[in-house]
């Protein structure tokens, strides 16, 4: 019989946030695959868990995944944990899950802590729709592309950042997105947990006197939909009317329908467009 891969969420700071189900599973499985065994041994020792461990991290995630899947196919049950939070959420996990599905190995996820959701729910920002970006790319070109995409993102944006990169990241976001409001969460669930509601400029001013410390989650307001619509309308209004018509007619849209679309874009009636085209 094939074993099961258990994705086990671990605390992001406060050890009391671990679930009874995760503790039971970590004790019952045959092997625990940990992102960093040196960190995870502290968690296991605290809860007196003696299950053997092996490393599974960013730099061995493919080769090691196949080794672990082979053990699963032999009938072994394996738990996957990361240093903090839920496997696969800005941490190793997605690759071994994909390989398990390809090999017909069962996977189940044991819910628990995730810094992005913890920060979002207490941010005071809209929670119904959000875009999780984790850490922005370090590659300069890719980073610029992602930040450019965020300019017109209307959903709440969640970004992770380390203290030594915080000022650089906030400065880049400020320059690209404007002075947005955000909630800054630091050291979540830990003794020195801190939440600050500010704008990018206020956060940069604050950083002049307070050196960034700890891990950060930035929960940023999305762009206002009405603002985007207004900007788009102004863009259409600046375009010559015939060029605006040609924009739609070049797509195979007949002139009558194109007039309707142009009128909508410009916030005027179809009759107004007709008169201007005479």
Regions found by a protein language model. Give the residues of each.
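Short glycine-rich anion-binding loops that position phosphate/pyrophosphate groups of nucleotides
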Residues: 12-13, 83-87, 163-165, 223-225
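A contiguous loop/helix-start segment that scaffolds small-molecule binding in enzyme catalytic cores
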Residues: 2, 156, 163-278
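Loop/turn-to-beta-strand initiation segments
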Residues: 3-5, 75-79, 155-156
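Glycine-centered tight-turn and secondary-structure capping sites
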Residues: 92-94, 255
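Short active-site oxyanion
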Residues: 26-32, 104-108, 156-157
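Class I SAM-dependent methyltransferase SAM-binding "motif I" and its flanking Rossmann-like core
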Residues: 95-153
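Conserved helicase motor
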Residues: 56-62, 136-139
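Glycine-rich, flexible N-terminal cofactor/catalytic loop recognition
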Residues: 1-59
């Amino acid at each position: 019989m094939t074993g099961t891969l258990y994705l086990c969420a671990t605390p992001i700071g406060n050890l009391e946030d671990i679930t009874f189900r995760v503790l039971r599973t970590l004790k019952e499985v045959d092997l625990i695959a940990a992102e960093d065994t040196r960190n995870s041994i502290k968690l296991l020792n605290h809860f007196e868990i003696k299950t053997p461990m092996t490393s599974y991290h960013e730099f061995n995630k493919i080769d090691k995944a196949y080794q672990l899947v082979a053990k699963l196919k032999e009938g072994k049950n394996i738990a996957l944990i990361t240093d903090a939070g839920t496997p696969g959420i800005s941490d190793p996990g997605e690759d071994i899950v994909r390989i398990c599905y390809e090999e017909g190995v069962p996977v189940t996820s044991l819910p628990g802590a995730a810094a992005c959701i913890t920060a979002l729910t207490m941010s005071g920002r809209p929670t119904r729709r959000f875009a999780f970006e984790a850490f922005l790319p370090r590659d300069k070109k890719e980073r610029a592309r992602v930040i450019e995409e965020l300019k017109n993102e209307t959903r709440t944006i969640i970004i992770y950042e380390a203290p030594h990169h915080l000022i650089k990241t906030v400065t880049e976001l400020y320059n690209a997105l404007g002075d947005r409001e955000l909630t800054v969460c630091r050291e979540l669930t830990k003794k020195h947990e801190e939440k600050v509601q500010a704008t990018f400029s206020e956060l940069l001013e604050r950083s002049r006197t307070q050196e960034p410390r700890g891990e950060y989650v930035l929960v940023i307001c999305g762009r206002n939909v009405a603002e985007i619509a207004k900007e788009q309308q102004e863009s259409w209004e600046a375009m010559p009317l015939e060029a605006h018509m040609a924009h739609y007619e070049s797509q195979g849209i007949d002139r009558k329908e194109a007039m309707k679309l142009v009128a909508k874009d410009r916030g005027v009636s179809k009759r107004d467009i007709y008169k201007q085209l005479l």
